[in-house]
Swiss-Prot record:
Keywords, in A-Z order: Cytoplasm, Methylation, Protein biosynthesis
Lineage: superkingdom: Bacteria
A cellular component term, taken from the record's GO annotations: cytoplasm
Stored HAMAP family: Rel_fac_2
The protein, known as: Peptide chain release factor 2
UniProt PTM: Methylated by PrmC. Methylation increases the termination efficiency of RF2.
Lineage: Bacteria, Pseudomonadati, Campylobacterota, Epsilonproteobacteria, Campylobacterales
Record function comment: Peptide chain release factor 2 directs the termination of translation in response to the peptide chain termination codons UGA and UAA.
A single MF term (Gene Ontology): translation release factor activity, codon specific
Locations listed in the record: Cytoplasm
PANTHER family assigned: CLASS I PEPTIDE CHAIN RELEASE FACTOR (PTHR43116:SF3), PEPTIDE CHAIN RELEASE FACTOR 2 (PTHR43116)
Gene3D superfamilies: 3.30.160.20, 3.30.70.1660, Release factor (1.20.58.410)
Residues carrying N5-methylglutamine: 251
Origin species: Helicobacter pylori (strain J99 / ATCC 700824) (Campylobacter pylori J99)
Matches recorded under Pfam families: PCRF (PF03462), RF-1 (PF00472)
Length: 363
């Protein structure tokens, strides 16, 4: 990097910083935080528990956004000032340090951009994830299990919690399907764009001739809704099936029919849960999954972008990302059009760069 390149970078980042300020309006955030704090001083504030909870969540969000913005702006202002002084004094040591820290400065601006993008209605929610293998038997079932592990490792990296709702073992390897929740701040906001078909190309570990195989798996993401969000489900529109839990969904395979499957006739959505020994709890979890999927479907219709992928054949259409392990190694996202070479790390859950790249591309 040289003086001209760094100078252009600073101009670009300052322009982004100005645009961010126009969007988030830091002074208005400060005023809103003052208003919330005064409201919380009222002795009657906690009488309405739901309203108090929502107000407190908003306070935390605004505080975090303001703090992230201020930290970014301070770093940028300091870099601009240091750059001018170093140029005037021909201070090569300081200039070299500024060049080294340029990626960190860029990342701090991008972090605020991501915060802004994660301010949608349900972005702060937990994420319900369903993974289904495509055609291809063991190959696709193994690929589905690799994706499942990838998301679990991502959750671990972010210190998020996960909870299995339903798990069906594959016939020889992998899984026939899995549904689980990732619980953490902005989990849904980060993962919402993972909806779609994921494609794997590799030398098959199940082929004695070591041929290259292509496998597909479908990932569906929906927000975990708060209990106070009202989604009406007409009993005549659903069928409940009860069966014995099996597989890794719970190491304790029940002798009673505690697992629950719900079919919603109008949409064709099917959800199931077997993570608990209690049929009642499994039914409640399955209903929550169904409500979340119906809610997301309605939002998509309102936005005129319904993409009901659970009704589509899992194959070449609707692909969002390709993971190629042979003859070369590369992960490429169709939305951001960015290719990544650190395939092993990605499959081990290092997917933040991919998720953020898609958020920026779709902004």
């Amino acid at each position: 990097m040289d003086n001209y390149t760094y100078s252009e970078l600073l101009k670009s980042l300052q322009n982004k910083c100005d645009n961010i300020a126009l969007i988030i309006k830091p002074e208005k955030i400060k005023q809103e935080l003052e208003r919330i704090e005064k409201e919380q001083e009222d002795p009657n504030f906690w009488q309405d528990v739901l309203k108090a909870r929502d107000t407190n969540k908003e306070k935390v969000r605004l505080n975090r956004l303001l703090e992230t913005y201020q930290k970014m702006k301070n770093s940028l202002d300091e870099s601009v000032e240091l750059f001018e002084l170093a140029q005037n004094d021909s201070d090569e040591v300081t200039l070299s340090l500024l060049y080294e820290e340029a990626p960190t400065l860029e990342h701090s601006v991008q972090k605020v951009e991501i915060e802004i993008m994660l301010s949608g209605e349900n972005d702060a929610s937990n994420a319900i994830i369903t993974i289904q293998p495509g055609a291809g038997g063991t190959e696709s079932q193994d690929w589905a299990s690799i994706l499942y592990r990838m998301y679990l490792r991502w959750a671990e990296r972010k210190s998020f919690k996960s909870e299995i709702l339903d798990y069906q073992d594959g016939e020889e390897a992998g899984i026939k399907g899995v549904a689980f929740i990732i619980k953490g701040e902005n989990a849904y906001g980060y993962l919402k764009n993972e909806n779609g078909v994921h494609r794997l190309v590799r030398i098959s570990p199940f082929d004695a001739n070591a041929k290259r195989h292509t496998s597909f798996a479908s990932v569906q993401i929906s927000p975990e809704l708060d209990d106070d969000i009202d989604i009406e489900i007409d009993e005549k529109d659903v069928r409940y099936d009860y069966y014995r839990a099996s597989g890794a969904g719970g190491q304790h395979v029940n002798k009673t029919e505690s697992a629950v499957r719900i079919t919603h006739f109008p949409t064709g959505i099917v959800v199931q849960c077997q993570n608990d020994r209690s049929q009642h709890k499994n039914k409640a979890s399955a209903l929550k999954m169904l409500k979340s999927k119906l809610y997301e479907l309605e939002l998509e219709k309102q936005q005129s972008s319904a993409k009901n992928e659970e009704k589509s054949e899992i194959g070449w259409g609707h692909q969002i990302r390709s993971y190629v392990l042979a003859p070369y190694q590369q992960v490429k996202d169709a939305r951001s059009n960015i290719a990544y070479s650190n395939v092993e790390a990605i499959l081990d859950g290092d997917i933040d760069a991919i998720l953020e790249g898609v958020l920026i591309a779709k902004a």
